[in-house]
Every structure is written in C-alpha cells, then in structure tokens.
C-alpha cells in the first residue's frame, strides 16, 4: 500500500527494483519456490507500461535478465482472485530484530536510471517521481542486506 499523495507509482517501482535481486528466478537467497518469487501486479495499462519500461531499463543496468513475474492483478487468480495480507508475524518480517540471520532480498546496489530516460511517451508528466534525490541518497536500499535491526519506523515527511 502506498499513498500517491506522497510518492508516485514510479517511486514505488524504483524501490521495488532496487530493494531485491529481481534476477533470482523462483526465490530470494536461500528461500526457493514460487511463494518466494519476485512479482509485480498491475491494475491498469499505464501501470503495465511503466512496469515494463522500468524493467527494461533496470535489466540493461544489471546486465542480466530480470525474472520478476509481471501480470495483471485481475488475472492472478491462483487463490480465486483474492488477495491476502501476510500473517501478522510476516508483516515487516525482515525489519524485526533477530528475525533473520541473513537478508534474502539481496539488493544489488544498482540504481534505476532516471525516469526521464525510460518513461513511456505520454506518461512522463502524469507519473513524475515525487521523492527527491536527497531521499534516495539517505534511504535507498544498499547492496547486500540493508534491513535495519531496529523497529521499523515511518520515514519522516521532512525526508520526502
């Protein structure tokens, strides 16, 4: 869930690509299986265009194929078309102190190219990033495990 008043869909995309290894196939780290695969599900054609364009740009920067599943949310009916929140103990799982001895997400330390360089025509102004480069310098995922071992606190509005 995100607040489009504070961040744009392309900010969410940037965080998504940079916060994990999207080339790891059916898993993350030592966790293997379809339930651990990377996936991004869209709700309209504009989101699909933005996801596909950002994927292509990030794939070029990584220099290897991205294996993230991209599909319409409405087509994802493995569970009867229903979406569920994770169990309470899985909410913010990696940010819980001592919850994991390792970070399975494995951020690659590669930043997504500037939006202007990959934005689909006609969508640049409507979906411009809202988060500043100062935000990304301070809060972007770092290579390896960037999960904090302290309570997960909201990012202050002053950092946005």
Give a label for each model feature.
Residues 1-160:
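Flexible coil/turn and secondary-structure edge motifs
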């Amino acid at each position: 869930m995100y607040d489009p008043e504070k961040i744009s869909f392309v900010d969410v995309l940037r965080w998504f690509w940079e916060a994990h290894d999207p080339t790891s196939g059916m898993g993350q780290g030592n966790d293997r299986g379809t339930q651990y695969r990377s996936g991004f599900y869209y709700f309209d054609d504009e989101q699909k265009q933005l996801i596909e364009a950002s994927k292509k740009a990030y794939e070029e920067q990584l220099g290897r194929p991205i294996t993230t599943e991209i599909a319409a949310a409405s087509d994802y009916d493995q569970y009867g078309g229903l979406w569920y929140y994770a169990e309470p103990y899985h909410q913010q799982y990696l940010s819980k102190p001592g919850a994991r001895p390792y970070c399975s997400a494995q951020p690659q330390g590669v930043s997504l190219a500037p939006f202007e360089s990959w934005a689909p025509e006609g969508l640049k102004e409507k979906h411009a990033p809202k988060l500043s480069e100062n935000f990304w310098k301070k809060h972007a995922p770092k290579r390896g495990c960037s999960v904090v071992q302290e309570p997960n606190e909201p990012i202050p509005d002053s950092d946005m």
